[in-house]
């Protein structure tokens, strides 16, 4: 669940925090006793010299030492939380936040969010940023087992071979002489119909293997030997699921989700086995105890919390566990209080669909018809872009949804719609080529962004969600949901359930305890503020 930070929205929320700063305590029913820790642990906060040019000016940098496992806090195992603190003039207390995710970095977001705080908030409250476990400068990174690596980029789709879209400099493929535009026809005597065949062949190899690659260059057949290298996978996942469904035509969702579940389970199992001292300890149950340890280490009896998107799950769990530690809380883009893996996955396509309906109304009324034409066209055709890549309905759905995550990106979204529409409907070849050229640039930018997000956040996203929510979705349940979602929202929508349902192969008993949840009342001194806005994704 991604949080989008915009100046207007942040200004509105922090003005709410400023208002709360002056609210007399509204006394609710007596709060339940604070849940005791299993054993006492004295958190330590160690300050260090901040990197040059750190912002805002005067920020303090620190590491908080906490137990690896709050269920056994005195077993001697610890980890560290990366912290930033900007002290206030009046020192009335602290305000902390989480920007969303799971996987969002509070340290990275710290300067930008601080710059938008109202002056009265800055004057009264210390501002505190931190990276949750597994994120940024905090401990418990997920490192995957060594995976086979050749450094090939492949054009999606195809049927007469796998076209190379590029090679990573210095990679085994580059050293062997393969270049962009080569079309791989065989690997070790096996016929390659498309890029997926090549990926499967590489996955079956081990570092050090020799792969004999036959390919076409300028129509002439050639052959090279590629020595398979290795790379730390970092428990890396695809942008949503390991493989796309068919590029065109009807989708057998039962077959797709079973294949996806098998692939995801293999990744999850390997990642968990490779990280016995980190993967089981990433859940929000652990994070809220880190958060309360940070409060204690900074000397606040209570403090203020602002959660965005996934950060509201942290806020809800913290409030339910430590209600007497909160002075005021703002839930910005709140998740449900009683989440499930099934609910998280199946609600995502509907939420994305709502943003698709709001986009034309807010930014481009003429785009609605064009979007419909594009989706209908892509259901039957793969668009060949001028940069040598292809755009499928799955690419379009994910890339366009990414653009709608922030209204500041609406102009780019409008350009994507207009130019792709022109590329498939314009009257002349020149007009179509011009439209596809612009669409290709936008598509490549979004493709790179989604790949970067997957590399940086997907593993933490999966392990936090699967630790927090202990129900497990089956491929059959996803298939049944997909059929309904497809009828209501279009063929491309069910695919977006993937990462939110990616708990295959992760038994709850091997992970952190589930978050406290439920619909029972949480009694706080100051009533919480919930902030929602149209167009949230």
Which residues make up each language-model segment?
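Catalytic-loop region of hydrolases
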Residues: 2-15, 27-144, 233-258, 374, ...
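Alpha/beta-hydrolase fold active-site neighborhood
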Residues: 238, 245, 369-524
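A catalytic-pocket lid/entrance helix-loop region that shapes and gates access to the active site
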Residues: 143-144, 233-249, 317-372, 418-436, ...
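Conserved acidic catalytic loop of the alpha/beta-hydrolase fold
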Residues: 288-302
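Short beta-strand/loop motif that positions the catalytic acidic residue
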Residues: 524, 529-532
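Active-site loop->helix "elbow" adjoining a glycine-rich segment at hydrolase catalytic centers
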Residues: 309-314, 322
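PDZ-domain C-terminal substructure recognizer with occasional recognition of PDZ-binding tails
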Residues: 145-148, 163, 175, 179, ...
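Alpha/beta-hydrolase fold nucleophile elbow
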Residues: 300-310
């Amino acid at each position: 669940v991604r949080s989008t930070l915009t100046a207007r929205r942040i200004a509105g929320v922090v003005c709410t925090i400023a208002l709360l700063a002056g609210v007399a305590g509204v006394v609710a029913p007596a709060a339940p006793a604070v849940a005791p820790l299993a054993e006492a642990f004295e958190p330590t906060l160690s300050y260090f010299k901040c990197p040059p040019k750190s912002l805002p000016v005067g920020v303090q940098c620190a590491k908080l030492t906490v137990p690896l496992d709050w269920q056994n806090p005195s077993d001697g195992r610890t980890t560290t939380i990366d912290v930033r603190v900007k002290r206030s003039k009046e020192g009335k207390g602290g305000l902390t936040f989480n920007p969303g995710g799971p996987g969002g970095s509070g340290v990275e977001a710290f300067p930008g969010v601080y710059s938008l705080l109202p002056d009265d908030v800055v004057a009264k409250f210390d501002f505190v940023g931190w990276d949750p476990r597994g994120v940024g400068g905090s401990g418990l990174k997920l490192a995957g087992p060594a995976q086979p690596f050749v450094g090939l980029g492949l054009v999606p789709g195809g049927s007469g071979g796998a076209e190379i879209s590029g090679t990573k400099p210095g990679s085994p493929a580059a050293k062997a002489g393969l270049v962009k535009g080569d079309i791989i026809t065989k690997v070790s005597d096996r016929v390659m119909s498309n890029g997926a065949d090549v990926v499967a062949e590489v996955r079956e190899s081990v570092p050090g293997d020799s792969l004999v690659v036959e390919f076409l260059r300028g129509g002439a057949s050639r052959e090279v030997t590629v020595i398979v290298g290795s790379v730390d996978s970092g428990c890396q996942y695809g942008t949503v699921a390991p493989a796309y469904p068919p590029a065109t035509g009807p989708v057998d969702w039962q077959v797709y989700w079973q294949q996806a579940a098998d692939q995801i389970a293999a990744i999850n199992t390997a990642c968990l086995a490779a990280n016995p001292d980190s993967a089981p300890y990433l859940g929000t149950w652990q994070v809220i105890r880190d958060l309360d340890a940070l409060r204690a280490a900074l000397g606040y009896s209570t403090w203020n919390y602002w959660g965005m998107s996934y950060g509201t799950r942290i806020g809800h769990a913290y409030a339910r566990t430590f209600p007497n530690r909160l002075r005021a809380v703002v839930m910005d883009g709140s998740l449900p209080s009683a989440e499930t893996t099934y609910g998280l996955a199946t609600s995502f396509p509907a939420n994305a669909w709502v943003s698709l309906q709001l986009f034309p109304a807010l930014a481009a009324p003429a785009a609605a018809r064009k979007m419909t034409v594009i989706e209908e066209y892509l259901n039957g055709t793969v668009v060949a872009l001028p940069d040598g890549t292809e755009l499928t309905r799955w690419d379009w759905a994910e890339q366009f949804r990414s653009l709608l995550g922030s209204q500041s990106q609406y102009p780019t979204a409008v350009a994507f719609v207009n130019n792709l529409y022109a590329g498939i409907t314009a009257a002349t070849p020149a007009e179509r080529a011009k439209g596809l050229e612009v669409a290709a640039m936008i598509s490549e930018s979004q493709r790179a962004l989604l790949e970067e997000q997957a590399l940086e956040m997907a593993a933490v996203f999966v392990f936090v969600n699967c630790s927090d929510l202990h129900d497990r979705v089956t491929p059959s349940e996803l298939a049944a949901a997909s059929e309904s979602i497809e009828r209501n929202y279009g063929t491309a929508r069910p695919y977006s359930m993937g990462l939110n349902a990616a708990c295959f192969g992760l038994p709850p008993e091997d992970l952190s305890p589930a978050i406290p949840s439920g619909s029972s009342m949480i009694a706080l001194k100051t009533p919480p503020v919930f902030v929602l806005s149209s167009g949230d994704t």
